[in-house]
Amino acid sequence: MLNECLTRCFHIGADGRHVAWCITMTTVYDIPADIFNPALAIAMADQKAVSMPDWGQYVKTAVDRERPPTQENWWQLRTAAILRKVARNGPVGVTQLAQAFGGKKDNGVMPNTPGVASRHIIRTALQQLEDAGLVEQVYLKSVQLYEKDDYGDFVYVKDEYGNDQKVPMKDEKGNLMKQDLYSGRGITAAGQKLVDNVAHSVRGEAEDQYPGLGKY
């Protein structure tokens, strides 16, 4: 049992005679994506909330792709990759993930331009992960809502000093109406436990394919 938990050791002192053993758990930061994502997709197979929608077999994953994916489990792989991104870089939003999963759009004789990934796919995957309890919205702040006219412009009134002031929105009880803003999705405790357990389970495979990982 001890050998399974001892993953790193450090030599302390100039003579190297003192050795301190650090009992650590392999985390999502230690495993390459090409090994981690398929293993995480398999681990999430029992999550009923994570499943490919009916339209998933017809869509492209990004504007720079020419055809839909051919892998049968591409939705699970993409969802696993999104969960890994959230675990490593969260809180993140749909736009950041769309840029991360994008590529280069072929413009023919013109220079290539960045092509973002499908936001609809990413948004749906995040909603499924949220339903599964693996990610959550990270609260940022609340902002006051103000009245607008039929043209979408703010409604102003004069204060006692003659300055224009926006009219705050109120509910039926006269309470000020506010809207919560979120900085993106972050991983939950259950999601962190899942990704760390998957990372620990594939550490041996990762060290076999990438021998240099054993140094870290």
Question: Where are the regions a protein language model picked out?
Answer:
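Residue-identity detector for glycine
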Residues: 13-16, 162
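Positively charged, polyanion-binding regions of nucleic-acid-associated proteins
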Residues: 74-91
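Short, amphipathic alpha-helical interaction segments positioned at domain boundaries
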Residues: 147-216
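Long, low-complexity, charged/polar intrinsically disordered regions in eukaryotic proteins
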Residues: 21-77
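Basic amphipathic alpha-helical segments that dock to polyanions
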Residues: 97, 122-132
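A short, conserved structural fragment
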Residues: 130-144
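Short acidic, hydrophobic short linear motifs in intrinsically disordered regions
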Residues: 92-113
